[in-house]
Structure formats: C-alpha cells, structure tokens
Amino acid sequence: MVNQTHEFLLEMTGVSKEFPGVKALDKVNLNVRPHSIHALMGENGAGKSTLLKCLFGIYEKNEGNILFLGKEVNFTSSKEALESGVSMVHQELNQVKQCSVMDNIWLGRYPKKGFFVDHDKMYRDTKAIFAELDIDIDPKVKVATLSVSQMQMVEIAKAFSYDAKIVIMDEPTSSLTEKEVSHLFTIINKLKEKGCGVVYISHKMEEIFAICDEITILRDGQWVDTRPLKGLDMDQIIAMMVGRELTHRFPEKTNTPKDVILEVENLTALNQPSIQDVSFELKAGEILGVAGLVGSRRTDIVETIFGVRERSEGHIRLHGREMKNRDAHEAINNGFALVTEERRSTGIYGNLDITFNALVANVDEYKTKMGLLSDKKMKSDTQWVIDSMRVKTPSHQTHISSLSGGNQQKVIIGRWLLTQPEILMLDEPTRGIDVGAKFEIYQLILELAKKNKGIIIISSEMPELLGITDRILVMSNGRAAGIVNTKETSQNEILELASRYL
C-alpha cells in the first residue's frame, strides 16, 4: 500500500500554537515511521487535539514544520489531508447513516459509467477492500444498521480507499466489546503490515502496550519524549504524562464499611431480556463493584433501582423501609443518585454553564416562596460543587463542554451529591478520562465512602474494580453469578463467574 522511501512518513517538528493569552503548543514534535503503530498520549488538555488540528489545517500553526513523505505540507482542510493520504478515524463517527456502506466510502468520488454511477464497480471495489482488511460487512446495507465497531471499520476502509499512508485513531475502542477490540487490532495490524503509520490515541494503558511500537508523550502543550514502548512500564509512562510519580494507580483505602443500609432482593426487570432474581446487600461506607462482560446487564441493575427501568418483582429496602422507586424523581427523593455511563449524551448539557449542569437535578431546592429562583443559593451551591469536587474552571459561568472529561465528571458527581443521596450509583465513572483525573475521581469516591455513603460502581476496567472496591458483584447474562471479596479474589475468578450463565 505504501511505497516506503522515507524513515518517517510524517514529521511534525517544533510545532507551536498560541491563542489569546494561552500557548496551547510549545515546540511539539511527532515523527511517525512506516510499518509502525505510534501511541500519542497525554492528559486531557496536554495538546493532542490541538496538534492534530494543526496537522489537518483546522488551526494555523504559529511555528514549526510539517513534512509528509519528505515534502513540506500545510493542509487547509481534512478533505485535502485525506486526499493526500492522511486520514483520521474520530471518536464520534461522522457518517451518513441513511446511506449504504459503499456510498459512505466513495461519497464525492463515485465511479462512473458514462453519466451514471457505476454501482457494480463500487460494490466490487468495496468488497476488494473489505477482503484485504478482513472486514465482513455487506457493502449494500445502510450504515444505520451497523454497530459502532462496524462503523469504525467502514471509516478505516474509507481511509484505505484513499491509499492513506497515515491513519490517526482517536479513542477507537471506547464503545467496543473485547471481541470487537480484538478484531479492530487485527485490522490495525494489517494497515501496519502494508506500510502505514498508525497514530493511536487512547487512555487505556493495556491497549497501548498490546498494540503500539513507539510512544510520544505530551504534557501541558509541550513535547516530553518519544521512545520505543519496549522497555517502558506503565509507571514510567504515567510519571511522564503527569509530571510526577504516581506511586499507586489507586488511593489507599482506609475506610471500614459499617452496617447494611441497602437490601436488594430478587430484583427482576419487567421488559426482558434484562436482569432476573438479582440479590445483594450494601453497607454504609462500602464500595460495591459490579463486573461482567458486555451484555451481562450490569447497567440494568442500577437503572431498575433508580426507577428508569420498570421492575416486575423484587424488593428494594433502604434502612429496612420498602422503596417503590417508580421513577427517577421518586428515587431521588428516597436518597438514590445515578451517574450515567454516557456522559456526553445523558450526563451533561454541553451548551450550558457549570451552574446549570451542577444544579439541574435539584432545581426545586432553589425556588423561593414567590416561585422565583434564589440566585444567592444557586451561586453558593455551584461554588460548593467546584470547591468540594476540585473542578478546574475559570468560572461557574464556563460552558461545561469546554472542560476536560475529568472535570465534567466531577461536576456531574457534585450535581448528585447536592441531592444528599445515601446511595450513589456510578456507571463507568472514569470512561474517557485521563490517568491523573482518574486518580482524583477515585479519591472523591473514597472520601464519599468515609462519609458513610453506600456506593455502587459499574466498570469494564478490571484493575479499577480490584483497586477501589470492597466487594464485587459479578453479573452473567442478567443474573448474579456471585459476590466476591475484592481482597480475596482474582481477575480469573471474576472472568469465570462472568461466563457462568452464557
């Protein structure tokens, strides 16, 4: 695919970018070889996105040089970059979902037969690319019918159709199952075999070590180092990313759970397939993890407890009192809070400020006798969220979409703490958050446990569950396969339980 005549396919040297009052990039380097997978890492705000926007011409760099295949380039658009052989597979996929797969691949450059589109050639060419990349998708189906994993594969095939030399992948596995991740890695390795340089952006350390050859680390808009991954360990990478040693990935747990406060007995959701006969107890000050494979219905547990999913039978008792929780409003009044998995779609109101996002779950608390909103109390509570959650922001009027993922998540956790819950349920609380911010979220969770909150955490990251929980409930195909003490269990035992009812 790639005619290899250069040591580096892409050379970005001394790239700087300034905005009014802010130096976003300060002499940053990124050099990508052919036949290699190159990790680009750094905390949120380190400059990764700005660097790539300079490459694609979205931002105009103030200093530095960009060489592609040995020639200086200054792309003015993503389209120009793509047509030149530099492609990006975004975290949020940008496809025409009502069109067919092959339409999406060849959009704007359809093969012609006379005045008409040559659909037969388009089909054959798409099938040929899919065969080369080991992609099993019908080119004629609508993109809307595909899974996220399949949509990503279509984007990779599109890059391949442009004879891309550089393929940039931004958090490509954030919504994929383990099996889908494995298939994606197979396809990425095929690109590598054909001479491509793949730039791989991810917060998941395990993936970086599994697939990448080299790593470039940015911190605070500056280039820290570029090294072969061989010989590096996770602690060294984290230290370079955050500028200090994190001697532990998880804060030390010093809290001892107290008496049982929540009893869940034979919980079954109304609309199946979902959870069936799930039972567990939760103590004050306890952190209960929920593990399971994708499709094990972990999220259904907290949604049923919170009243957004109807139950057909079962009991929920808080301090021995039966809780109906027929909807989310009733659950909130009963002392339950839920931080949802999809932060962008169901957690934040991106175009609104921190005040709105912090207070939206508790609006009635701010109404005066006249029916107006108390500005003083709203400001006070917003400031409490910013201070207690350690949110990094210039102002409470800042749009939440401009904050990093970690700071957005802190605002959402603060929002629910304002409702004064006894039971806090967190679904994938650190997804898409960098390693330094994860540590801060873990600290907040442990502090809440010390205040005798009952905490339930759903996570797909096994080290996270083993690092901060007291016990782990393992789900398998909608049923509870077992509950294990975190200190006494292992990853293998959890995986065995997760497969029990498959």
UniProtKB/Swiss-Prot annotation:
GO terms for molecular function: ATP binding; ATP hydrolysis activity. Part of the ABC transporter complex MglABC involved in galactose/methyl galactoside import. Responsible for energy coupling to the transport system. Keywords: ATP-binding, Cell inner membrane, Cell membrane, Membrane, Nucleotide-binding, Repeat, Sugar transport, Translocase, Transport. It comes from the Bacteria. It catalyses: D-galactose(out) + ATP + H2O = D-galactose(in) + ADP + phosphate + H(+); methyl beta-D-galactoside(out) + ATP + H2O = methyl beta-D-galactoside(in) + ADP + phosphate + H(+). This is Galactose/methyl galactoside import ATP-binding protein MglA. SUPFAM superfamilies: P-loop containing nucleoside triphosphate hydrolases. Residues 10-245, 255-502 form the ABC transporter domain. Its main location: membrane. It comes from Vibrio vulnificus (strain YJ016). PROSITE patterns: ABC_TRANSPORTER_1, ABC_TRANSPORTER_2, MGLA. The gene is mglA. The keyword Ubl conjugation does not apply. It is a peripheral membrane protein.
